[in-house]
Amino acid sequence: MSSTTLTDDQIRDNERTEVLAKATAAKNIVPDIAVLGTGPKNAILRAAADELVARSAEIIEANASDIEAGRANGMEESMIDRLALDESRIEGIAGGLRQVAGLTDPVGEVLRGHVMENGIQMKQVRVPLGVMGMVYEARPNVTVDAFALALKSGNVAFVRGSSTAVHSNTKLVEILQDVLERFELPRETVQLLPCQTRGSVQDLITARGLVDVVIPRGGAGLINAVVTGATVPTIETGTGNCHFYIDAEAKLGQAIAMVINGKTRRCSVCNATETALLDAALSDSDKLAVVQALQEAGVTIHGRVAELEAFGATDVVEATETDWDSEYLSFDIAVAVVDGVDGALAHIAKYSTKHTEAIATQNIETAQRFADRVDAAAVMINASTAYTDGEQYGMGAEIGISTQKLHARGPMALPELTSTKWILQGTGQIRP
């Protein structure tokens, strides 16, 4: 072995040292970034958008290295799609930066307040969280999203992408840091963590006192590893095993269109429909129409073959238990027949990731029962699951879809990346 070759332990030690040094640098600039004015923040975001477009050739070249390595390592095409950047997607990322610049700055917003009987004026205001760690997989656009939303909400971004996107992420962060430097702000306002080993994730999520919150975004394995292993507070952006229940009183053509949209519009995202539940009270011809429409759209059907063949379906892949709780992220869908809305609710309760659940029905009482009883961050009544999206909600860009119940639930936009503090202003009052 060459004298310059590092052992695995030395690589980990160096990585740990780098993470803690970067975390310390991030923590040190929190007070200054927290009070940065709205005008400068917006100017930086717009300049960053222009710079990304101007240097798109550099980004695409770096991204090509990641895609080449991904294909060589057998990466699935659904993940290649998440990884890929071209001029159109870079324009979209730049547009996202400009959009965030146009959003209302949440920092300093007064949520409530009053004057106490003794004359003390009190108010609750929004304040940044501090150092915001992001751990995510093969989507380099998240790097820029994290920077934009962190900066606008007064936070410092500490990002750790997948090793599969290391060239893309390195180039994107370099460009963002160049823009920050132009505005005389620390390059540490956004930093990329090393990803030579998975140990850097553990270093990040246990950096209590340096990192204020960690938000994982990706597959179930990544999210569970972060949430269960962290000592730093986390916000869980869950996987999306989204169900669409078609009630016997649904408008069938409308329901079919919504299921196909939810499944095929972009199958590699977390709001894609992964399971279609068919009311047993639907006629055999209606059930068959749903299955055939999906197949004609290029979707592979997984289900209990005997159950689906009973109403005439063909070319069905026998489902295993795994199919019912899978986030396919591909042109695959699980299909099951259930006993009415309560059967749908029971199935969803067993397999849901509590992301988005949908119902198609013209019965108001059935719709209300579904909405009241299903446990999910978002409930769609006669609408595609694809609408679970911060931009669609009118919230602007989001950092992810939170499926937990504390701090934030659903699309996490700027207000969800803040906390609050109470400010009391008196004139010398003392408490008796």
From Swiss-Prot:
Question: Matching InterPro entries, A to Z?
Answer: Ald_DH/histidinol_DH, Ald_DH_C, Ald_DH_N, Aldehyde_DH_dom, G-glutamylP_reductase_CS, Glu-5-SA_DH, GPR_dom
State the compartments where it is located. Cytoplasm
Gene Ontology BP terms? L-proline biosynthetic process
Q: What is its EC number?
A: 1.2.1.41
Q: How would you classify this enzyme at the top EC level?
A: oxidoreductase
Report the protein's function: Catalyzes the NADPH-dependent reduction of L-glutamate 5-phosphate into L-glutamate 5-semialdehyde and phosphate. The product spontaneously undergoes cyclization to form 1-pyrroline-5-carboxylate.
Q: Which PANTHER family match?
A: DELTA-1-PYRROLINE-5-CARBOXYLATE SYNTHASE, GLUTAMATE SEMIALDEHYDE DEHYDROGENASE
What is the name listed in the Swiss-Prot or TrEMBL entry for this protein?
A: Gamma-glutamyl phosphate reductase
Species of origin reads: Corynebacterium melassecola
